[in-house]
Amino acid sequence: MIVDNLKLEKLIGKGSFGEVYLTTKKGDTKFYATKKFDRANIEGTEAMKYLKNEIIILQHLKHPNIAKYEDVKKTKKHFYIVMEFCNGGELSKALEKYQSKHGCSFSEEIVQHLMRQIINAFQYIHKLKIIHRDIKLDNILLNYETEEDKNNLNLMKATVKIIDFGFACKISKTGLQYSTLGSPINMDPIILKKLKSEGKTRQLGYDQKADIWSLGTICYEMLIGKSAFDAQDMDELVNKIEDGTYVIPTSVSKEVISFLNGMLQYESHKRLNCEQLAKHDFLTKNIKDFHKIDVKKVSGKITGEGLNINVKKNRTIWAIFNSEDENKLSKIGGTDFTEPIEEKEEIESKNSGKNINESFPMQNQSAYSGPMLPNPFQGIPGNPTNQQIYGSSEQEMAQEGYVVKGGIFD
């Protein structure tokens, strides 16, 4: 398909509201990722608001660890959002492949390499007074310089790219936000509490420290291979976070425990900010100099080989976490658009001899998802609706300055 100077070469992903295509531009040898949205399905919906919001925010973000926005086009039937293409796909998929290949989650060295870049990106985002509000492994892409590194899953050579700013917002004049947006399993306890109460706790506000909690949850998932607060439904999730305990095997270093504890604090004011995290020993020290926990030196009764950390009471206790359990761990878990332009269907797609089908296989779920988001509790009894998870009322969004007219950066 030809859209202006774009050539949509191959479908590489699908989502709730649209599709993602590997794309080339006339006179350009680079690949791009183009999100295609059906206007009949998206115009007048909440998803359209998120789409406009994402475009406006991305136009103002320029950072090596944030996927670059390239262009937006409109035809009579579709919207097209052109983004930087990242050949490594989603970080969540990389973790699954790594676990399948090596039988374990990422090493501390790999997590250190990835978290340095992620924290670097969020230092930049937070300095612009923006809250992302939907940090999860699906919304982090990887890019490799060589096909060999990509094929060998050489994560130490991977560059991180943050995506999906549809739910992002600029901090209000009060410094707090109130709407319930995001993915529950990575959600700040305050937002989750509001979500569970169906918005009745309006007085509970949050700031950029909400992102810090989410960063803690993805860091944990990369290290341990599962969610810190693994749950089958909303009630169980809320109860686990309210209890405030997550388990870390004693094979990890003290630096890792301290790093996680700096993010996964129930009370947001106790969490470290991005500047503090960037200077933390886990990100600045050589892995070889890390201190491993010696169980024999820990006072008190040892009931197993794991450390329970209570994020609500900010204390630590020892609990059962044996090697058999550890082996079972696995991932569970207003912008101005151009006037409509013409779309041209092509029966065959040729691109300078590049084998598109072999180099870029179809993905089961789309990266660059934008508003094309699944319900993380779909099919689970007692699960919240998409509206509860992903959006607040239009009135509440307007009160935050979230519904954009002319741009949130005006």
Name every feature range the model reports, one short phrase each.
Residues E19:
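Conserved N-lobe ATP-binding subsite of Hanks-type protein kinase domains
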Residues L114-M115:
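Activation segment signature within eukaryotic-like protein kinase domains
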Residues K77-E90, A94:
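Conserved short submotifs of the Hanks-type protein kinase catalytic core
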